[in-house]
From Swiss-Prot:
Enzyme class label: transferase
Record flagged with keyword Iron-sulfur: no
GO biological process: DNA-templated transcription; symbiont-mediated suppression of host gene expression; symbiont-mediated suppression of host mRNA transcription via inhibition of RNA polymerase II activity; viral RNA genome replication; viral transcription
Record EC number: 2.7.7.48
Complex formation: Influenza RNA polymerase is composed of three subunits: PB1, PB2 and PA. Interacts (via N-terminus) with PA (via C-terminus). Interacts (via C-terminus) with PB2 (via N-terminus); this interaction is essential for transcription initiation.
Gene name as annotated: PB1
Positions of the RdRp catalytic domain: 286-483
Compartment annotation: Host nucleus; Host cytoplasm
Taxon lineage: Viruses, Riboviria, Orthornavirae, Negarnaviricota, Polyploviricotina
Keyword vocabulary terms for this entry: Eukaryotic host gene expression shutoff by virus, Eukaryotic host transcription shutoff by virus, Host cytoplasm, Host gene expression shutoff by virus, Host nucleus, Host-virus interaction, Inhibition of host RNA polymerase II by virus, Nucleotide-binding, Nucleotidyltransferase, Phosphoprotein, RNA-directed RNA polymerase, Transferase, Viral RNA replication, Viral transcription
InterPro entries per the UniProt record, alphabetical: RNA-dir_pol_NSvirus, RNA_pol_PB1_influenza
Sequence motif: Nuclear localization signal, positions: 187-195, 203-216
Species for this entry: Influenza A virus (strain A/Tokyo/3/1967 H2N2)
Region feature Promoter-binding site, mapped onto this chain: 249-256
Name of the protein in its database record: RNA-directed RNA polymerase catalytic subunit
Amino acid sequence: MDVNPTLLFLKVPAQNAISTTFPYTGDPPYSHGTGTGYTMDTVNRTHQYSERGKWTTNTETGAPQLNPIDGPLPEDNEPSGYAQTDCVLEAMAFLEESHPGIFENSCLETMEVIQQTRVDKLTQGRQTYDWTLNRNQPAATALANTIEVFRSNGLTANESGRLIDFLKDVIESMDKEEMEIITHFQRKRRVRDNMTKKMVTQRTIGKKKQRLNKRSYLIRALTLNTMTKDAERGKLKRRAIATPGMQIRGFVYFVETLARNICEKLEQSGLPVGGNEKKAKLANVVRKMMTNSQDTELSFTITGDNTKWNENQNPRMFLAMITYITRNQPEWFRNVLSIAPIMFSNKMARLGKGYMFESKSMKLRTQIPAEMLASIDLKYFNESTRKKIEKIRPLLIDGTASLSPGMMMGMFNMLSTVLGVSILNLGQKKYTKTTYWWDGLQSSDDFALIVNAPSHEGIQAGVNRFYRTCKLVGINMSKKKSYINRTGTFEFTSFFYRYGFVANFSMELPSFGVSGINESADMSIGVTVIKNNMINNDLGPATAQMALQLFIKDYRYTYRCHRGDTQIQTRRSFELKKLWEQTRSKAGLLVSDGGSNLYNIRNLHIPEVCLKWELMDEDYQGRLCNPLNPFVSHKEIESVNNAVVMPAHGPAKSMEYDAVATTHSWTPKRNRSILNTSQRGILEDEQMYQKCCNLFEKFFPSSSYRRPVGISSMVEAMVSRARIDARIDFESGRIKKEEFAEIMKICSTIEELRRQK
């Protein structure tokens, strides 16, 4: 069917067609190989932007550090990181003047959070740099390893389970002359396989103790590991992102909590809200500017882009901001919050895996680890890499590069938003003291600036003043990439505004389709995504109906569950045909069992099992929802599950969907190949951790789940809980006397074992 594409747009306003220009169909690009080159680019660029700052040497680690703060004022339009302390402090003071009590109240809220946060807050998040093993690990494992090492080195504050006490341990650990850690290593040896009589390589995993002196420990504690950012659309070059270690994370969390509390009270901040709430907030600012620009005034909006936001921000500036924001607060609070920026101004960037070399002629491959880059002969590298290495060499220590200026991606999003908003705040007439004034929106490094003035010259003057003010605090608006329009049309954080926000539907495209969790969850997630897009993203009824049909088709191909009466032959068709023939009420079969689809756009909110329950044969119901079915590893039945859906940009979103556990809710088994690698020890630790947590939650079901307060350990808490429950059960006649006695005996045995240990 030939369609002239222009016909599709005849009835569509131009702004609604914007989504067709987005690069969001198909697979996003992933990075392969090492991120070392990208990291070196980041380090070198960051130093270049601050090159006229002062060099000093860190007395503890010996790392050379560049400090651009209060450096020369820029004379051209090149990006630079020379923020002026007094300007930043003044911007903060004016922000407080416009919002009386904002800092005071945010500090009080944050203090409350600090008192209550448990150390398990740090188990959230994905990959974390594990300083004990010198590589990335899941957050929970990295935390467990850190606590284990702290404990074996005599640091015990964290036993209480409060995050603030764990942070006390971190501070104390930095004063220790040495730290003893346990590292994993693997031995390879060649042995003869008894079955095949061939020689095979056998790997064994060992744990060994290692001592780190103060300098080595500090370097590791201040290290951010780097990786390449994956799945970034619309970019030609990849870039590096950082994962901090456990020593830094807790401090960053508290600073961001404070900044988040401030952002919530600022009408120009696009964080921490999202979705429709964010759109409403933004629409308010635009409305204010348009109503206030009387008939005599012009109003223009800049869709802004900042050059290398992170690399021109400076942790020393953040320290100044925090010092000002917390100025009337208790000493302990000020100290806790100032540690994150101090650690960041002494941070080290780990260069990743290093480079892979291969010789085609000799069929040889060799890995050059990052640690060797300081000493290796540069003749092996190509021109561009050679330049990078030469530039970074003075900064290298043990395979990490000293990186004092700059922030690395995504570390202080909230706090840097506060800085951006403080400049937008200066646009009020009482501060500009002239005929032009401005306002706008800021969300991390993205901004929209609305300027009002009586004439075009006034608009130009306002933009120039904004541009220069930004320069003073290390923000570099890009003149090449920002563009200006009559107010009413602009883009901000991929929301397109044209007299109201236009749905940018293409952004949601990647989340349509079959997730690949299991038959039950996939069906549920698929229809929920369509339902949500009808609510939030202008997905019209006809398109939604089509999306639904495409989804069902996709689903059937994925799980090979075509209708029982189909001609399509797959591995499953024989079984499904048999089921189809022996089913009396065919309308009751689930799609995944070869049934037909009952969904339409009116009933997307009903789980498929519920939709078809009344139509099912009785024996089919019995097989489908049978908790004793031995082939299904059942999770406990929750009424609502969370799926991770990938929007086109921004982090993966969590989306709720209704979950009805059936024999289709299977959990796939883990890949076995991990068991032969050095990860095996870690996997065992992880399973152990998981088992302990599961056991603990059996004793404290969520309804009565109060975290044990005070110093009792998990075991003590469980034993005392078991005793209480047993006594209640015995007195109410739910258990016999013998059972009660047996429980008491087990509890005593456990306590005895703990005492002996």
